[in-house]
Each structure stands twice: as C-alpha cells, then as structure tokens.
C-alpha cells in the first residue's frame, strides 16, 4: 500500500460491443486507479464488465465487435488507448501480464510446461537455451511447484489444476511485469488450492513490489488479498473504497447484497439473503434505475432463519458411531425408520494401464470402503478436494461407473442387482444435477424437449400436451417462465441454465436427487438463489439429497449430515453443524482453515500487517 502516484489510471472508460440490436455498454464510464505495489480488487457478477475492463487495458478485445468509445488508460504516463499496435505489444506481457480463470484451457495441450514458459521468456528478449531453461526452472521454483524438473517435461493434462495455475503465474511473471492482472484466478480451484494461490500472489506482490488487479465475483476472496475494492454492476463502478471500509460500511445496495449472499460457517443460517433482498432494478428505456429496499435488519434476520431445522440420523445410530449429539436446532429421524439409501463398503477401483499393449500395472482406489445411510427428507453433504472420491461415489450410486464391490440399497432393494423395467423405475426416482450447466444441456434441444424427453422415457404424463404442461409447471416452480420452453440453452445465463437442469431432474418426479457440484460454476449471488431454490423444493416435494461440493461453507448450509472425504475414504462423519464446531480430523480442520475469512477483525489484522511491511 502506498500514497505514491498511481501506476495505472483509468479515466471515464467506455467499451461497447456492436450487436444487431444496437451497442452493448459492457464498460460504461468507469474510473479506477492502481498504486505501485497495491492490489485493487474488482468484484461483480458475470456480465458486470470486470473482465472486459481487464481485456480493454491490454486491448485484447476483438476489433470487429468491440471498440473503446471514450476514456483514457494511463500507464506510466502513456495512454494505452491510443498507442500503436507495435507499442501495445511491447506492453503486453512485458509490462502488464494477465492470468486467466481456467488454467486448463489457457495452456496449450500439445506443448510441455518448459516449452510454454520458455516461449514467454524468449518474448522478453532472452534467447540462450541454457539461460531460458535456468529461468524456467527458477520461475517454477518461485511459484512453489514441487519437483520442477519433472513438471518442466510434463504436458498440461499431466499436472493438477493448482499446478496449472502456478504454471500460468510463472508465464505471467517471465518478463518481470509491473502489473499482474488476475482474472478469476482461483474460481476453478478447490478451496485449499485457492488459499495456496492467494498466499502465493501475496508473496510475489510483496517480494517483487508488483501491483495486482484482482478480479473476482466473490467478496470473500477479495477480502483476503485486496487493499482497495471497486464494485461493478452492469458496466458501472457503483462503489469504491478500502477493503475494510467496504466490508464495515457498504453504501450501495448491490454491495450489501454481495456481502450477505455468501454461506457462512458461523451461525445457523437456514436461508441465504440475495441481491434482490436489498434492491430492485427498473429499466427506463436505455437507462437502469436501482432502487434500494429499506428492509429493517430484524426482517433480514427473520428471512435468514426461515426454514426447517436440521434433520439428523436416528439418535441410536449416531450414538453407536460415537458422534456427539447437538443440544438444539435439530430433529432426529425416528429410530424405527429405515434409510431410503444405504451404502455399505463401496469400492470403485480404476486400472492403471501402461505400455503399447495397455497392460494393467496397478489400480487407483477412487472409492475405498465408503459406508453411510441417508434418510427420507434428509440432505447428506459429501465434501472434499478434487480427487477425494466424492463425485465417483455419487456416480457409483447411480451406476454410471463400474463398481468393484460393496452394496447400494434403495428403499430396501439391492439397487446394483436391478435389471430391465425395475432398473428403469428406480432410475426415475433417483436423478442427478451435474456441475456444469453449460455442458449438461444439449445445445440443439429446446428447453421443452430437454424436459419432456425424460418424461416420455419414464412414462410420465398421458401425452405430449400433458408433458408440456408438466414441464411448464416445473419451470415455474424453478423460477423460470412458460415462454422459456421454446428457447435454446445459449439464450440463458448460467444461473438460468442451472435452474433448467434442476427442472429437468424434477420433471420425472424423483424422490432422491444427487447434486454434484451443482453450484460451483455459478457466481456467489446466483449460487445463493439456486441454494435457496433447492431447499424450497426439498420442503415442497419432500426430496432427499446427496449434495457434493468442495466448499465446506456451502455444504454446511445445505446439509443435515456431512461426510468429509479424503483419499477415497470418509475421514469424518456427523451433523454438519457439529463438524464445523468441533472437527476431529486434521483434514477437516484444513478445509475449514482454507475458507476465506472476511470478518472485520481478520481484514483489519491483514491490513495492519500490510502497513507494517509497506
């Protein structure tokens, strides 16, 4: 943090996209400044203009469809808007570098890590093969990659998501830039890897005296790294301030909504507040009017406490497992009630094949002796990092992957032994909502076909007209409109697509739904809406869920019971509130510690440490 002159100043910038329906004002008259060695956090939902702002700084937008309508971008005394192409190319990478959200698609799959980092070093003017290799090794060590010699010879698909992002950071640092633009660099990562990347960026910023423009949709992440914050909404900056001021005293209703919609580990929140609880938006021709809702704090607290208590497994079952019973705020399943789903000693092993003849040389125990019960109306949360076995467990229950051994009983029947019509009937009653709403909907099918197709397969509805009526009713239940039936997936936002996926799962009237990372691809504000919807549907329809996620905060909010998975095993099991209050396993404690801490005391402490080391 510094009081020196800004290294980057954006003054009244306007970036528009040309469309058949007129210009889209993606960035609409914004002004920002970034000081030397400072981190500016830019936060907002998808479509707010934050990423377009970053791309505009480096003039990376396609000239055929986008143009800078007005404004200045002054970097070290030069206006980047009017620089010739050759001059702006000297700025890109060398003076201002950028890392993107998805490291898997940012790296070229046909080149090794060494080749890709080396190429960036050569662009900076170093051409000696020996020196390029030495600097590549040094950069990989600097960004915290273990065994950098091995990683240098690896291809992107051979390294983890966290390692890929570290490689991207190494590439960005290769020419010693003054500014690093980090566009959602942790969104695609597990919470523990996210914490490591944030630590790394802080360390690099301080050691290199580098400025960072950090873009995110999550104010919790912003609180961990930023000195100042700019909140963007519909192309405009609606609020700016120090990170402590923004969290302590937010002025704009949109900022208040973003702060309120994140699931918190502390407390017993049964319903998440959303941006719409704080403001409404009216469109008057081309202008947008934001009206703040003056909702008393007591009313907001009442909204958060609305909903049923936790539904815990029978007391006797928990006592046998040695689990501490909570004092209040919970209802127990009756002792004589049988589970709707029973999983016993589930094993899923995948063969490791090598050589020309693809001989099996070993196996990966993706799921290794997993057992649990789920009772009707309950939500069991499966939480853990990527590779822990949680998604494979869900897919094994659905019989989407081969099971090595174990039992899966649904309503007392051996689900693994079902065949023919019995299996078809059971599959109608167990549905799944996948992680990515973009890839789980067929782009060639209308919403109506996506919903009525499964109904026809499972014999739901008398005829096509009846199925269409049912689809329309289900869409409305999920917060969409009947007229959406005739549209295609590309015409919807990410949150709307996930609502369509939920409606598709519910269209065949299931009793049990497996939600596999079903909100991890969404902005936190949209995530809150979808989580509330899932809870409402559970209450209205009496649904039972298995809720899979890497985010302990989300799982705690959604779940009655929680199973923490690591290395294919359940390492901790119990009531979700109790696991947060009193975790018994080191891995669980690690997951909890990795969640961004946006309490005022923690933000204040981080800022004081920054002041001391400035």
Label for each model-derived stretch:
Residues 80-97, 123, 245-250, 356-361, ...:
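ABC ATPase NBD coupling module
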Residues 4-6, 146-149, 243-340, 353-358, ...:
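Short catalytic/signature loops enriched in Gly
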Residues 93, 157, 175, 490, ...:
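Conserved signature/switch motifs of ABC ATPase nucleotide-binding domains
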Residues 174-178, 507-511, 527:
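A short, proline-enriched helix->beta-strand linker immediately N-terminal to the Walker B motif
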Residues 79, 131-150, 414, 465-483, ...:
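Conserved ABC ATPase "signature" region
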Residues 68-79, 406-414:
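Conserved ABC transporter NBD signature motif
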Residues 237-241, 570-574, 582:
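ABC ATPase "signature
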């Amino acid at each position: 943090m510094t009081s020196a002159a800004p290294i980057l100043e954006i003054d009244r910038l306007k970036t528009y996209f040309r469309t058949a329906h007129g210009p889209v004002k993606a960035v609409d008259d914004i002004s920002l400044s970034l000081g030397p060695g400072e981190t500016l956090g830019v936060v907002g939902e998808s479509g707010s203009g934050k990423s377009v702002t970053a791309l505009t700084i480096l003039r990376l937008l396609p000239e055929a469809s986008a143009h800078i309508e007005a404004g200045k971008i002054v970097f070290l005394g030069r206006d980047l808007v009017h620089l010739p192409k050759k001059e702006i190319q000297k700025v890109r990478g060398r003076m201002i570098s950028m890392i993107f959200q998805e490291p898997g698609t940012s790296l070229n799959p046909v080149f090794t890590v060494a080749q890709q980092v080396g190429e960036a070093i050569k662009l900076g003017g170093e051409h000696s093969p020996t020196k390029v290799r030495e600097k590549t090794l040094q950069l990989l060590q600097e960004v915290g990659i273990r065994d950098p010699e091995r990683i240098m010879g690896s291809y992107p698909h051979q390294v983890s998501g966290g390692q890929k992002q570290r490689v991207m950071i190494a590439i960005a640092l290769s020419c010693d830039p003054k500014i690093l633009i980090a566009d959602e660099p942790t969104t695609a990562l597990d919470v523990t890897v996210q914490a490591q990347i944030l630590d790394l960026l802080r360390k690099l910023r301080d050691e290199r005296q580098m400025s960072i423009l950090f873009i995110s949709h999550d104010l919790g992440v912003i609180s961990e790294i930023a000195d100042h914050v700019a909140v963007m909404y519909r192309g405009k900056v609606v609020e700016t301030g120090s990170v402590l001021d923004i969290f302590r005293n937010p002025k704009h209703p949109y900022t208040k909504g973003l702060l309120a919609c994140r699931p918190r580990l502390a407390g017993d929140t049964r319903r998440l507040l959303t941006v719409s609880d704080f403001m409404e938006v009216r469109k008057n021709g081309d202008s947008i009017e934001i009206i703040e809702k003056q909702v008393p704090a007591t009313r907001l607290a009442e909204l958060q406490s609305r909903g049923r208590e936790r539904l815990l497994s029978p007391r006797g079952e928990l006592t046998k497992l040695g689990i501490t019973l909570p004092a209040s705020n919970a209802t127990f399943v009756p002792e004589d009630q049988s589970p709707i789903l029973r999983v016993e000693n589930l094993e899923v092993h995948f063969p490791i094949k090598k050589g020309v003849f693809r001989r099996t040389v070993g196996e990966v125990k993706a799921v290794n002796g997993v057992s649990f019960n789920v009772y009707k109306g309950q939500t069991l949360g499966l939480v853990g990092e990527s590779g822990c076995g949680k998604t494979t467990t869900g897919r094994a229950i659905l019989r989407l992957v081969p099971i090595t051994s174990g039992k899966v009983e649904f309503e007392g029947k051996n689900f693994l032994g079902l065949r023919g019509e019995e299996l078809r009937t059971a599959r109608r009653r167990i549905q799944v909502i996948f992680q990515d709403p973009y890839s789980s909907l067929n782009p060639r099918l209308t919403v109506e076909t996506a919903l009525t197709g499964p109904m026809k397969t499972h014999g739901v509805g008398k005829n096509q007209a009846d199925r269409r009526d049912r689809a329309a009713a289900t869409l409305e239940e999920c917060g969409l409109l009947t007229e959406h039936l005739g549209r295609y997936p590309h015409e919807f936002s990410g949150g709307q697509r996930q609502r369509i996926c939920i409606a598709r799962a519910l269209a065949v009237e299931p009793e049990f739904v497996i939600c596999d990372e079903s909100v991890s691809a969404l902005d936190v504000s949209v995530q809150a809406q979808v989580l509330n919807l899932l809870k409402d549907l559970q209450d209205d329809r009496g649904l039972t869920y298995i809720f899979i996620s890497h985010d302990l905060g989300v799982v705690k909010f959604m779940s009655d019971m929680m199973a923490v998975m690591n290395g294919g095993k359940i390492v901790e099991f119990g009531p979700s509130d109790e696991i947060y209050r009193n975790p018994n396993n080191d891995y669980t404690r690690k997951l909890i510690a990795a969640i961004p801490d946006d309490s005022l005391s923690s933000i204040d402490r981080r800022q004081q440490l920054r002041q001391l080391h400035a």
